[in-house]
Amino acid sequence: MPQDAPAGLAPGFLVAAPALADPNFNGSLVLMAEHHAQGALGFVVNRPGPITVADVLGGLDAGLRERAEGAGRADDPVLVGGPVQPERLWILFRPGPAAPEEGAVALGAGLALGGSRELLEALVRARDPGPYLLLLGYAGWAPLQVEREVGEGAWVPLPLQGDLVFDVPMEKRWETAVRRLGLDPAGFLVGGGGAEA
């Protein structure tokens, strides 16, 4: 049965229904950063890509790569944030005393988002920057597209919860989100759809 799409999906999460066949989003948990009349923007937060933090930092500055290695972050995967602009780097982080806030947007629930080289360098150089994720690309929806997909049951909205991003292992994020919806992942079945590729 279709459900009514909420008026404001951001900040929050979209949990992909198992029937969502689009390979870009099957089994995904999407952090919604923007949702307005012009469309929506979000980031898949549970899909590792083929490159690491060291790969990204090494292309910018060898010193940054060494700093990430020293902090034990060099082998962390860079996530596939979505199929739109897959070359564009985004940084999702937990603001804190050592984490810079300039060039970032607070999303709520202890999460902030930015995309500047300066922000990335400041996080890597900080003594204790707190957790952060690097993402390449994003998920984008045309006006009313995400509302239609939610109404068709392709996605189920979940309120923003910062711990889903930084305290739950990546491979458990979708399952944990489904459980927080009060559903059993094994029996969670609803309709189709998919964001823009």
Curated annotation (Swiss-Prot):
Highest taxon above the source species: Bacteria
Family matches, as Pfam families: DUF179
Family indicated by similarity: Belongs to the UPF0301 (AlgH) family.
SUPFAM superfamilies: VC0467-like (SSF143456)
Source taxonomy: Bacteria, Pseudomonadati, Myxococcota, Myxococcia, Myxococcales
Gene Ontology CC entries for this record: cytosol
Protein name, UniProt field: UPF0301 protein A2cp1_4106
InterPro entries cross-referenced by the UniProt entry: AlgH-like
